[in-house]
Regions:
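S-adenosyl-L-methionine
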Residues: 1-11, 21, 44-74
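Helix-to-beta-strand junctions that scaffold the AdoMet/dcAdoMet cofactor pocket
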Residues: 7, 55, 110-112
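Conserved SAM-binding loop of SAM-dependent methyltransferases across substrates and taxa
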Residues: 19-31
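Conserved SAM-binding motif I beta-strand of class I
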Residues: 32-37
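Mobile active-site "lid"/loop adjacent to the S-adenosyl-L-methionine
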Residues: 83-101
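Conserved beta-strand signature within the Rossmann-like core of class I S-adenosyl-L-methionine
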Residues: 109, 113-120
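Class I S-adenosyl-L-methionine
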Residues: 127-172
Length: 172
């Protein structure tokens, strides 16, 4: 979904750095990646992963994704993995208030034709509230400006994660 639109000329956002898999994926595609996380462990793991791949086109930022507008104002793509960092403290989770603030800024900052991918893990405490908040937010985006799609499995148990995809059709 993102690889279809991101080129070596583009700047992109990894809103939830985590273990650095998405940052690495984006760094291979884009000119510049801005990656955010509130956990030092995430920054270190990601720095190591990028170094092993020989990539240096990512700015790793120890801050919440809601601060992204302090670092850049327009970009081609953004990715979120909502939930918690699997190998870390499971009480440190993404929260609806900061996630919605970040999503608003992403919708403003996306270039025309730009895309955002939001993977929602919600089987943990607080996850259901964030899931509902995100779905409510994206369902209210104006259809003249955005296309929003949902990709989910329907025959899996135990709260399987699902993907929300946003494409910006035009500037305001």
């Amino acid at each position: 979904f993102l690889a279809e639109v991101v080129t070596k000329e583009d700047t992109v956002v990894d809103a939830t750095m985590g273990n650095g898999h998405d940052t690495l994926f984006l760094a291979k595609l884009a000119k510049q990646v801005y990656a955010f996380d509130i956990q030092e462990q995430a920054v270190e793991k990601t720095r190591q992963r990028l170094a092993e791949a020989g990539l240096d086109n990512a700015q790793l930022i120890l801050a919440g994704h809601e601060t992204l507008d302090q670092y850049l104002d327009h970009f081609k793509a953004a990715i979120f993995n909502l939930g918690y960092l699997p190998s870390a403290d499971k009480s440190v989770i993404t929260r609806p208030d900061t996630t919605l603030e970040a999503l608003e800024k992403v919708c403003l900052g996306l270039e025309k034709g730009g895309r955002a991918a939001i993977m929602i893990y919600y089987g943990h405490e607080g996850g259901e509230v964030e899931k509902d908040a995100v779905l409510d937010f994206v369902s209210q985006l104006p259809q003249q400006e955005f296309t929003v799609a949902l990709y989910k499995t329907i025959n899996q148990i135990n709260n399987p994660p699902f993907l929300v995809m946003i494409e910006k059709l035009k500037e305001k």
